């Protein structure tokens, strides 16, 4: 199937490793030019170099999305350097390992305000696209309690719930100006350096319990999420608006009407 993505332009946040990197790589594999950001310069440049090796225009910068002024300035610069914008993937998230009020503040500024700043800054550019798409990366933690055993799990889950609600609400208005908004909510996704990797080191029995809860018989991989995101980003999903897709290997037990 031709996803009709070749030559399009995308911004992916939090894309130096894990899910974000795999999303950027999968977009690049479809011929999409990609701008990425994350907090660590060396990781960003390594990721961007890998994307360029896929034969597309790609660049990245060290940006803290929680710093709204710096982030919005980078977004404007990224659009200019890309020469336009078709796809915005808000993937960045605050670490659920941050406890207490600091974790709540970081989750609010990164997950929620990061999405708001991204949408507010990029809407005028996306409106110029013939097939504009926004994809938020949330989590099944936004609709379930105590999915991830981490000190900042409460803030993490609440911020993802807010992100799901925000995405669903703006999807109705932005669709009227040609911008589709959808949400992907991952279940337990394992990758080196990720939250479930930390669970494996600290409490391997919890990792095994999560694996057993996935009826498909394994934890997810970043590629599982990237596949869903790239579908939502493509014109092939042009009749899909405001959806929250659970990609969780059957982890959730309730019926999602």
Identify the function of each model-found stretch:
Residues 42, 62-74, 223-224:
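The beta1-alpha1 cofactor-binding region of Rossmann-like NAD(H)/NADP(H)-dependent oxidoreductases
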Residues 53, 176, 186-214, 254-257:
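A glycine/serine/threonine-rich, flexible loop-to-helix segment
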Residues 6, 230, 241-257:
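Short C-terminal tail/terminal secondary-structure segment
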Residues 16-18:
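Conserved glycine-rich cofactor-binding loop
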Residues 94, 101-120, 135, 163, ...:
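Catalytic Tyr-X3-Lys loop
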Residues 110-130, 142, 171-172, 176, ...:
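Amphipathic alpha-helical dimer-interface segment in Rossmann-like NAD(P)H-dependent oxidoreductases
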């Amino acid at each position: 199937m031709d996803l009709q993505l070749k030559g399009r332009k995308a911004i992916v946040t939090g894309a130096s490793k894990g899910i974000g990197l795999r999303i950027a790589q999968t977009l690049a594999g479809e011929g999409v030019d990609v701008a990425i950001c994350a907090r660590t310069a060396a990781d960003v440049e390594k990721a961007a170099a890998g994307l360029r090796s896929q034969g597309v225009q790609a660049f990245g910068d060290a940006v803290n999305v929680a710093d709204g002024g710096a982030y919005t300035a980078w977004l404007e610069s990224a659009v200019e350097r890309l020469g336009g914008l078709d796809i915005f993937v808000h993937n960045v998230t605050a670490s659920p390992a941050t406890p207490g009020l600091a974790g709540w503040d970081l989750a609010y500024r990164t997950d929620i305000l990061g999405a708001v700043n991204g949408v507010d800054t990029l809407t005028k550019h996306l409106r110029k696209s013939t097939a504009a798409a926004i994809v938020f990366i949330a989590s099944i933690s936004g609709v379930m309690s105590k999915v991830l055993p981490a000190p900042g799990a409460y803030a993490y889950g609440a911020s993802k719930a807010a992100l799901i609600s925000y995405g669903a609400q703006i999807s109705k208005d932005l669709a009227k100006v040609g911008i589709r908004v959808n949400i992907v909510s991952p279940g337990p996704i394992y990758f080196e350096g990720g939250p479930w990797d930390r669970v494996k080191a600290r409490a391997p029995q919890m990792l095994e319990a999560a694996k057993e809860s996935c009826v498909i018989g394994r934890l997810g991989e970043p590629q599982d999420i990237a596949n869903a995101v790239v579908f939502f980003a493509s014109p092939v999903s042009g009749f899909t608006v405001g959806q929250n897709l659970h990609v969780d290997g059957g982890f959730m037990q309730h019926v999602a009407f």
